[in-house]
Amino acid sequence: MKNMMPANVILVLAWTLSGVCRDLLSTPAFVQHAVTAGGIPAGFLPAIVFVIAAFLSFSTGTAWGTFGILIPIVVPVAQALDPTLITVTLAATLAGSVFGDHTSPISDTTILSSAGSGCSHIEHVSTQLPYAMLVAVSCFVGYVVSGIVGGSFLPSFGAAVATLIVLLVILHVRSVRSGDTGGEKEEENSAAA
């Protein structure tokens, strides 16, 4: 139970903040008006929400707090703009939040992972970033396609997988051309041991 206390406190504070934003500040109505008045097409909402969630979570170091802040805002906005995009926009919120938390140097999970594995904190962040960025770019493309096709799963999944494959092929070709196969690091590590 002691291990769950920080998560419970974050959730209670996030729910409190979301209640204040929803009831006292009318944040969903304000954001909805800003989105519609700004002329942002509804199809780009999931991709935009993904980027906002990633930035907010990266900046704060908490995915749970980002869930609590953004979900009460983006669900009513998605419902007002295009009800078929509610699920996709919610998924974009969750994915962006987890990506931001995973890559944030101030995230508690990142700090604990580096401490638990016995490696330098900044080194841990820098080694996680390329892998997370590959998936984030693929997700972003998938959310753009999903928004354009109205939340359909297969086209967005296909676009995300195709993007990931293209990025992996590009990285492979670059590593082959530069002669970096990763073998040198393995040789250095075995020589140091």
Protein language model features and the residues they cover:
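Hydrophobic transmembrane alpha-helices that form the pore/transport pathway of multi-pass ion
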Residues: 59-99, 108-125, 167-172
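Membrane-core helix-loop-helix motifs of multi-pass transport proteins
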Residues: 110-167
